[in-house]
Amino acid sequence: ASETYLERLWKIFKQATGWDGQGTAPASVTLSTSFGAGENHLGAVGGHTDIIDVTVLMTLHATYVANDFVGLSGVPLTFAGCARKNGGTGLIVSAELIDYALQSVAGELWLFNTPIVPPADSAAWTITDAELLTLVCVIPFSTYYASALNSASPVGNLTYPFKCRATSTSLSGAFVTRGAPAYNSGDVTFRLGVLQD
C-alpha cells in the first residue's frame, strides 16, 4: 500500500532530525507550534453584527425643500467600521433614521464605498457619474413611528452587499430629503446594522 500524507511527512521529519519520536527529543530538534496570522487578530471569521450610529451635522440647519442634500457642505457622512478589516466585505441588514425634531419627512440615505463630495447643504442633490459608480445602495425612509418629542423610521430585512476600499473599513453616506423638514444640526441620527464577513 502507498504511504499516506502523514506517513510521508513523518518519514521526512525523522530523516531531517534523526529523531524517531521515542523519548525526549534531542536539543537539535526544535518543535514550533506558532503560525503567522492572515490578519491582525485571530478568531474572527465573519458573521459578526455591528451597529454604527452617525449623527448628521448641518452647515445651514434651515428649512429644506424636497430633493435637497442635508449635511455639512461638501462633506459626506462616514460610517466607520462597517467592515472587519481594510477592504473587507459585509451586508447592510438594517437601517434606522432617528428624528429628534419630530419632522417625520421622507428621505433617503445614499451609501457609497468611496468618499464622495456632496453639494452644499440645502442645495439640490447632485453627484457625478463616477461617484454614482461607487454606490452601494439607497435606503428610503418613509414610515415613521412618533412619540410626543421625536420619531424613528426603521427599515429591516435589507441585504445590500458592500466591499470597502482597500485602505478603509468605512462607507460614505449622504442624506437626501424628499420633503421640507426644518432641521437643526444634530437633529438626525442614522443607525446602520451591518453583518461583517
Report each predicted region and the residues it spans:
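Beta-strand signatures of extracellular beta-sandwich domains
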Residues: E108-N113
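Short aromatic-acidic-glycine turn motif
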Residues: T114-A123
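A broad, structure-centric signal for solvent-exposed, well-ordered loop/edge residues
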Residues: D99, S104, P118-P119, A146-A148
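Extended alpha-helical regions
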Residues: S122-T126, L195-D197
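Extended, solvent-exposed segments with strong compositional bias
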Residues: T128-K163
